[in-house]
Structure formats: C-alpha cells, structure tokens
Amino acid sequence: MNKTSNNKLIYSVLMLVCVVGFWLFENFYTPNTYSQQTENGPTTSVASNLMPSSTTGDIVEHSHYMLSYNEPFEQAEWVAYTLKKEHLTNDDRKRPYFIEDPKVRTKSADWRNYKGSGYDRGHLCPAGDRRFTEQAYNETFYTSNISPQDREFNAGIWNELEMQVRIWAKQHGELFVVTAGVLEEGLNEIGQEDVDVPRYYYKIVARGNGDDLKILAFLMEGKQSSKPLKQFVVSVHEVEKRTGIDFFQKISKQQQDQLEAKVDTGSWKFKF
C-alpha cells in the first residue's frame, strides 16, 4: 500500500470514529434530568390561586414552571409560570440537549420526533425567561415544554409576543403566564410517537390580585403574520371554549364571569 492510500485509509477510519462517537454521545450520553442541581437565584413559585384546571390529571411541577401533560397529543395542554422583573437577565447559558421529562408519568415525547419534520421545537416556557440560573434555563429543555411550531411563526409573531410579555414583566414587576397549543382532534402528526401539530396557540397573561387582577388572552394561528399583537387578543372564555380548560377556576365565580368575558387591552401598553 503506497503512502497516499495509507493516508486515505487513516482519514476514513478517523471520520468513521468521529461519526460513531457523535451518534453515541447524542443518543446515549445525554443527562436523565435537569432538576437535581441546587442553585441560589430568584424564586419562581407559581401563584396557586391562578392555576388552571387539568383535563388529564397529569400535572407536573418543576422548580421553575408547572405543566399539565396530555399523553394522546404528546405535549402539554398548558405550561404555567411566574415571570418576574428580576428573572430577566442576560446571563450567557450553554444550550443543553432536549431530554424527556422524568416527571411525566407516561414519559414525554422523544426529541427525535421533531427531527426532519420541518417544525421547530417551540418552547412554551421560553428559555429566554429562565437565564437567571443554569437549572432554570436547562429545565426549559424538557420535551414536555415544547410543541411543534412553524419556523417562521416561532421566530416571528410568537417571538414578538414573548418579547412583549417580557416588557410587561419589567413594567409591572411580576406576571403569571399560561400557554400551549390548542389540542383538538384532526391535527397533523410528526414522528414515530405521533406528536400532534397544533393549528392554534394561546397565551394568557395576568397581573395583580384580588380586585386588581388584570387578564389578557391571545389566540393565534400557527403561521407567521405581520399583524399587530392586539389583533390576536380574545376573551379568556374563547380560549376556554377551544381548549376545555378552566383557567382561573380558583377565583370567585363572579370575578371569573367579569374578567373572562371581556377583552381589556386598555390596561396593557403594546410595543408590537
């Protein structure tokens, strides 16, 4: 064997080792959980009096958000979290791998269902809202916290809504947020586990408490739009009708009827 042939063989073997090594790392050397770390940082307890109902009973509580998992659709029917002004930091975090949620009884969908599907792994509790500690950031990479989203939608109007919520958190100090895709029959599916692709997504934002409680709900089709965010505002009743979820079940019936039926954009300043 001449020198040129020998070099080609060595190069080919090295390439094969690299490819196999990357595959093994990607498939077998990811962590089992992101919830074992203990770090000092801002508190993120979710306001119990604002928690929505669960149509499945499969409620999971993480350190920095809660969710209700819907196994037939292989994603959360809602993710709820508190967003405070002090949560919004510019800490540089290393992006971790997406992993299955160890707290979901039936196991959340594997991230590989999204591979080659053409859809983004769209965060529900945004990673950008949880940069204040490594644990908080990493917890957003459980697959129970993602939903298939069109890439232009995820990077466009949905991202604008997330940025608008951050602006409100800075203005008002603290918000309660609940969000997910609308899970309904007849949706397209991706991957071996048949992860459903929602046609619509909702986000409900609340601030204050008692008689000072202010609520704003958004419902938008999962495709890019140049419309201002105000055009996607709906009543909470509309989102409840579409999802079957009772979003503010623990406040008085009188206050529910009053707040959930109206659309109050006047109490919120819009940038987008």
For each feature predicted by the language model, list its residue ranges.
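Domain-level detector for secreted/extracellular nuclease and nuclease-toxin modules, and
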Residues: 2-272
